[in-house]
Design a protein with these regions (language model features):
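Conserved glycine-rich cofactor-binding loop
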Residues: 9-11
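Substrate-binding pocket helix/loop in short-chain dehydrogenase/reductase
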Residues: 89-91, 97-102
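Conserved glycine-rich Rossmann-like NAD(P)H-binding loop of the short-chain dehydrogenase/reductase
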Residues: 23-39
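Residue(s) in the substrate-gating loop at a strand-loop-helix junction
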Residues: 133
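Conserved NAD(P)H cofactor-binding loop of Rossmann-fold oxidoreductase domains
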Residues: 81-86
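The beta1-alpha1 cofactor-binding region of Rossmann-like NAD(H)/NADP(H)-dependent oxidoreductases
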Residues: 34-35, 55-67, 95
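A short, exposed helix-loop element centered on a Lys and neighboring polar residues
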Residues: 113-114
């Protein structure tokens, strides 16, 4: 089985990749940093015999989300995990960074879910996990 994990270069995404590799799943690791993805791949392959493909791509760009879907097929499990946050006084935070955050944290999830779900429905098989931050439910001060 093939699992595609976005935000796989660190944190929850990296940890999920390690756990799923231990269970024998083949992985497609996605993140902006090819260098970090390569380190994750090497670390996983030290102890696991699975196939790992890395894809370095910025999911804040809608076209890149579509490109990822066109490039990576036959996904059994999609883990939408890419994301980042920003905090500070609203009038002082950077608008471009906020728009990139919205595109990564919301738009990319929507696009990838829509595209991969269509594939999964066609083969009548598949799972999608959307990872979210508690900040979406209980934002902290100045977020």
């Amino acid at each position: 089985m093939k699992v595609l994990i976005t935000g796989a270069s660190s944190g929850i995404g990296r940890d999920m990749a390690e756990i799923l590799a231990q269970k024998g799943y083949n992985l497609v690791l996605v993140s902006r940093s090819e260098e970090k993805l390569q380190k994750v791949k090497e670390n996983i392959l030290k102890n696991n015999k699975v196939d790992i493909e890395i894809v370095s791509i910025d999911l804040s760009n809608e076209q890149n989300c579509k490109e990822l879907h066109n490039r990576v097929k036959d996904v059994d499990i999609l883990v939408n995990n890419a994301g980042f946050g920003d905090c500070g006084e609203f009038t002082k935070t950077d608008l471009e960074k906020e728009l990139k955050m919205i595109n990564t944290n919301i738009v990319a999830y929507h696009i990838l879910t829509k595209l991969y779900l269509k594939d999964m429905k066609e083969k009548n098989s598949g799972k999608i996990l959307n990872v979210a931050s508690i900040a979406g439910f209980m934002p902290g001060p100045l977020m």
